[in-house]
Amino acid sequence: MKKRKTVKKRYVIALVIVIAGLITLWRILNAPVPTYQTLIVRPGDLQQSVLATGKLDALRKVDVGAQVSGQLKTLSVAIGDKVKKDQLLGVIDPEQAENQIKEVEATLMELRAQRQQAEAELKLARVTYSRQQRLAQTKAVSQQDLDTAATEMAVKQAQIGTIDAQIKRNQASLDTAKTNLDYTRIVAPMAGEVTQITTLQGQTVIAAQQAPNILTLADMSAMLVKAQVSEADVIHLKPGQKAWFTVLGDPLTRYEGQIKDVLPTPEKVNDAIFYYARFEVPNPNGLLRLDMTAQVHIQLTDVKNVLTIPLSALGDPVGDNRYKVKLLRNGETREREVTIGARNDTDVEIVKGLEAGDEVVIGEAKPGAAQ
């Protein structure tokens, strides 16, 4: 009886083991097969760019000021007017400059008359001195009279020299007065558009220490872009790199140029440091305007016809620019070591390790998993 119970117990244990094995086998056979997100490796182009926000300004902008003091009698332009080089923009009351010219001219006339008188007196002094010399030979006059005549002649000669110096000084004053009269006419130093008027007609300007600004001219045929670049990106920039931008009102049109320079002085914005990279673009149609916001792209690298894969396909690093990559072949995955080159925010160049047509794993998902 005891032996039967032992045999029965063994059968039960064996049955449990078999059932457990069958359940395990069923689970293995019915386990969901992993599915992979893959990409076929193909040649393509890879660009690496720095993104920045910029502002537009005119390439050439000039503050037109007054070089003489006085009331702005007329202002012939308004904001937005287009002007030509040497076009009359305004006039400062010329009365003071005209009166100064008249005053200096009158002084010059007086000095020239004095010079004529001094020349006549010098001529008389020379005649007197010659006569005194002849009389002195006959002892008809004393040596003192002869010396007096010589002194008188020298004094008259010196008077002419003094008058000549005064004439030169006043001639210079006359030239300055005429120049000041010319300065009362404010003309455009270049062709451009009036973008700002600082002094209104009727206001008085004082040019005692520095030229007061009347208006601002901008040449809008070419624009200067100032791109605000972070300190992390600025180390990659250098003159000559390609740059392009779009504006908010026309995101489909690209305006292209080359980096001109990177200003050395940074700007601090909310504890972040930024530098300004500048480049020029033509504006023949006048569509670009002052202070427009530009979405700037500065191209760091541009490689053509190279093998690229997404950054998400890179596995663990195994050395300098070397990574593991999973390949899918005949439903099975294999790891392969690759060497990378240029990269951007989404893709990377494969220098070695893959061929066109290889299928790389970029992700893995199981059926029923949330996508």
Swiss-Prot record:
Membrane topology: Single-pass membrane protein
Disulfide bonds: none
Top-rank taxon, per record: Bacteria
Effect upon mutating G353C: 4-fold increase in susceptibility to macrolides. Does not stimulate MacB ATPase activity
Segments forming a coiled coil: 92-137
Annotated GO biological process: polymyxin transport; response to antibiotic; xenobiotic detoxification by transmembrane export across the plasma membrane
Primary location recorded for the protein, binned into one broad class: membrane
Inducing factors: Expressed at very low levels under standard laboratory conditions.
Locations listed in the record: Cell inner membrane
Cross-referenced InterPro entries: CusB_D23 (IPR032317), MacA_alpha-hairpin_sf (IPR030190), RND_pump_MFP (IPR006143)
Topology Periplasmic: residue spans: 32-371
Pfam families cross-referenced by the UniProt entry: HlyD_D23
Subunit structure, interactors included: Homohexamer. Part of the tripartite efflux system MacAB-TolC, which is composed of an inner membrane transporter, MacB, a periplasmic membrane fusion protein, MacA, and an outer membrane component, TolC. The complex forms a large protein conduit and can translocate molecules across both the inner and outer membranes. MacA interacts with MacB and TolC, and this interaction changes its conformation.
Family, per entry: Belongs to the membrane fusion protein (MFP) (TC 8.A.1) family.
The protein's name: Macrolide export protein MacA
Species, as recorded: Escherichia coli (strain K12)
Gene expressing this chain: macA
